[in-house]
Amino acid sequence: MGTLKPRRFLIPVDGSFQADRAAEYVARYAEAFPACEAVLINAQPAETFPTRTPDGKEILVEVDDLGSKASAAARTLLSARHLKYRLITELGNPVEVIADAARNEEIDEVVMGSRGSGRWESLIVGSVTHKIIHRVSLPVTVVHGPSPMQKAAPGDLHRLLVAVDGSKHALRAVEYVRKLCVAGLPVHVELINIVLPIPESYAGISPSADQSDNYYRSHGELALQNASEALGSVGVAFRTHIVAGDPAEKIVELAEGLECGRIVMGTRGLGSAAGLLLGSVAHRVVHLADIPVTLVR
């Protein structure tokens, strides 16, 4: 499969247990793929010091102290797994600080808790996490609390549900998985296509069961074709599934039923799956899922 190249994660931390779960995710990830490194980042907004006369050294010392406290649990988790990490503390807007680090620190993937707390505004979808998903071009994995790994064995984290609809945006999720396999990460993929149900009656005519099955199969196979070829070309173990229904609900339902440890999807898509569009299907999946969701742009 190739040489194990260190995979570098950016983990925003703010002292909340949700942000600590992001560090736990990376620690569990490393159980199957030891070649991991992490950059922990904590940002303190300028308004944290509203009544202070700016004194560069004094404020930066306090920023470092706050960042050290906010990252304590995350650092303990990573150290216990002997993961190499570095802590960055910055004074500034959290979104800007995270986005800059994603660009400048040779990061492969951003991993964020779905919610946060404290003086650093919440890492809640719709706020910092939501903005980062839009701002950075890297894959972003959203990890839910209190502990996304409670039900999962270490290997299950690498049983991935990958949702595709045949669009180039969805195929980026497939390429993400393909690269993981080439890098040496052991993965098993459940490749799914969700087809919108045929209306019960169209122009007064209801389709037969055979007609419906043929429709779903033909549309699903077409949407899955390129993804199947891409995964098969590098020896990824995968199964295909074609299901009719609400895309977000079915993605989450299948992930649970197939005992997947993570959902991977493109942030934009078109076609019969109603579009895996951030703010629509992908946004709903992030809210509905109990397991980590990786969004690939």
PLM features: what roles do these ranges have?
Residues 1-5, 23, 32, 99-150, ...:
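Gly/Ser-rich helix-loop-strand patches that form or flank binding pockets
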Residues 1-4, 58-61, 76-110, 229-263:
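Structural beta-alpha unit
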Residues 2-57, 155-207, 230-232:
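Small/aliphatic-rich secondary-structure junction motif
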Residues 14, 90, 116, 165-166, ...:
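Structured loop/turn residues at secondary-structure junctions
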Residues 27, 72, 130, 175, ...:
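Active-site phosphate/pyrophosphate- and oxyanion-stabilizing loops and adjacent acidic/basic residues
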Residues 39-41, 86-90, 141, 190-192, ...:
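General small-molecule cofactor/ligand-binding pocket signal
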Residues 57-69, 209-222:
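A short acidic, glycine-rich active-site loop
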